[in-house]
Amino acid sequence: MKRLSGWDAVLLYSETPNVHMHTLKVAVIELDSDRQEFGVDAFREVIAGRLHKLEPLGYQLVDVPLKFHHPMWREHCQVDLNYHIRPWRLRAPGGRRELDEAVGEIASTPLNRDHPLWEMYFVEGLANHRIAVVAKIHHALADGVASANMMARGMDLLPGPEVGRYVPDPAPTKRQLLSAAFIDHLRHLGRIPATIRYTTQGLGRVRRSSRKLSPALTMPFTPPPTFMNHRLTPERRFATATLALIDVKATAKLLGATINDMVLAMSTGALRTLLLRYDGKAEPLLASVPVSYDFSPERISGNRFTGMLVALPADSDDPLQRVRVCHENAVSAKESHQLLGPELISRWAAYWPPAGAEALFRWLSERDGQNKVLNLNISNVPGPRERGRVGAALVTEIYSVGPLTAGSGLNITVWSYVDQLNISVLTDGSTVQDPHEVTAGMIADFIEIRRAAGLSVELTVVESAMAQA
């Protein structure tokens, strides 16, 4: 048994009927032409043989009586793979758009807390001897880095326990839960002086710094109202696109930018197009960009990240200026978070009362209007650098996306995988007519950036990826 951290628990409390807090991982897998018999039962056997490597798949959420403390993970519960791993069939021959639509349907329902907080869907019907595995994992269980590490373990790209047998442990009693909660409360009280000291040290660094705080961080409650900011519907829609990583790296190098800057700039250009289309005007936006502070390859669970607020120059019609301003704003936001301390929010999250936090997030999710903190979430996660396998089958593509937050109907998540930069977009049912408007806008903006920089507008074709939708 282990206690959810305050930050893990906040991600649990923020889930409501219309704000689902699961993340999605999509792996496209190419079957050998002589191994077409690989089906959902064979896949269940593969996962069963690796459960000892993928410990979080056995975590069962256990609430503390009277909500006396954050919930706990029972670390080795009974796992019913027939429940967790489910078949799904596309109408053959399915392509990118058909798979995206299936992922949107899968994302539209929350996870059942009576079971470990994950599901996998074995999707058949893709063209070219391919299948897909869609993993739905609660954010309280793992952040982007932990999910990438767990996926790498599952594909044998990272070492885990070589020999092992999955053995369930007994469920705790109410007395054990209350006793552990009381002891942990005493420990948390003992950590308050260190948390206050961490906070005052951060504020002291801010006072002494010549750069101070970024404008986005000092005015965090003023994002403009837009088409994407409203009360969410429970429905989810999903879209993907792929760029060649070599093209993005070359463009970034020429412009003195990072891959993360390029992701922000492409997102800004696409959002500008959509703002003009849906709102008739384009104003600067405020994006929350997660920043991890624990990149340990051994970590496969938990949340060790903070969110920095980055202003996006969606009002600018100059693609190169958008890259430059995104770079400057990202640098400023990173410096601000380093000054304050990257663990500031997560440390104080330990003291959020469970019942009060759940009530607050229910109220926020039902409000009809803009999010008062941000317009959208944008993530860029470095994924595996080597091609993975599931059994003997080759993983050709990986896509990932995080959840939507209250009042924000758009999430853009980018994962790199070997030679690919894979874009994923999640929306609710009322933000855009088609989420592929966002992915198409990002590709179009990348082409405009390259054109303005004097680079070829002919993009490298990623042969291993599905054709664009």
From Swiss-Prot:
Protein name (database record): Putative diacyglycerol O-acyltransferase Rv0221
Lineage: Bacteria, Bacillati, Actinomycetota, Actinomycetes, Mycobacteriales
Matches recorded under InterPro entries: Acyl_transf_WS/DGAT, O-acyltransferase_WSD1-like, O-acyltransferase_WSD1_C, O-acyltransferase_WSD1_N
Induction (UniProt): Induced in response to low levels of nitric oxide (NO).
Matches recorded under NCBIfam families: acyl_WS_DGAT
Keyword Translocase: no
Active-site feature positions: H139 (proton acceptor)
GO BP, one annotated term: biological process involved in interaction with host
Domain of life: Bacteria
Membership in a protein family: Belongs to the long-chain O-acyltransferase family.
Keyword annotations of the record: Acyltransferase, Glycerol metabolism, Lipid biosynthesis, Lipid metabolism, Transferase
Pathway assigned to this chain's UniProt record: Glycerolipid metabolism; triacylglycerol biosynthesis
Xref: Pfam families: WS_DGAT_C, WS_DGAT_cat
Catalysed reactions listed for this entry: an acyl-CoA + a 1,2-diacyl-sn-glycerol = a triacyl-sn-glycerol + CoA; di-(9Z)-octadecenoylglycerol + (9Z)-octadecenoyl-CoA = 1,2,3-tri-(9Z-octadecenoyl)-glycerol + CoA
Enzyme Commission (EC) number: 2.3.1.20
GO cellular component: plasma membrane
Example GO molecular function: diacylglycerol O-acyltransferase activity
Physiological role: Catalyzes the terminal and only committed step in triacylglycerol synthesis by using diacylglycerol and fatty acyl CoA as substrates. Required for storage lipid synthesis. Upon expression in E.coli functions weakly as a triacylglycerol synthase, making triacylglycerol (TG) from diolein and long-chain fatty acyl-CoA. Has very weak wax synthase activity, incorporating palmityl alcohol into wax esters in the presence of palmitoyl-CoA.
Organism expressing this protein natively: Mycobacterium tuberculosis (strain ATCC 25618 / H37Rv)
Enzyme class label: transferase
